[in-house]
Amino acid sequence: MNKRETVQTFLDAVQKGEFEFASSMLTDNFEFRGPIPEPINKKTWLEMSVNLKAAFPDLNYHFKVIGTDGDIVRSTTQLSGTHTGTLDLSNISLGSTPATNIPVSVKMSKTRITVKNDMITLWVDDPVDGAGLTAILVQLGVKTQLKM
């Protein structure tokens, strides 16, 4: 697989909630950087992703791979779904929010995913006002200290 195909396969697994398979595509020192209190490792990212899917069973990431530049694959994401389960983000210091049945849809953000030796080492979600996890929390009425 080329880098673009590797990222597309990974993003497809995340979209389907196939987190065990997605995990197998991440290096042990994988890091996610985005609109969260601090960068997180593979284990914490997987827990957060599983918890997001549990809180939003219809979660759609609207992933789109848009290009490559060396080891970096550029993509976009635009989250939407309905909050029908508990959103437990205690593993990233954001507490737990009971189901609200509120539908959310956030703005598109750009991401950069680094691939080395057919494995994903880094996922950077560039901050955009009204996008990502911060925007979801705002739409749910959750007060946080996160910057958008």
Regions found by a protein language model. Give the residues of each.
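C-terminal and inter-domain tail/linker signature
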Residues: 1-148
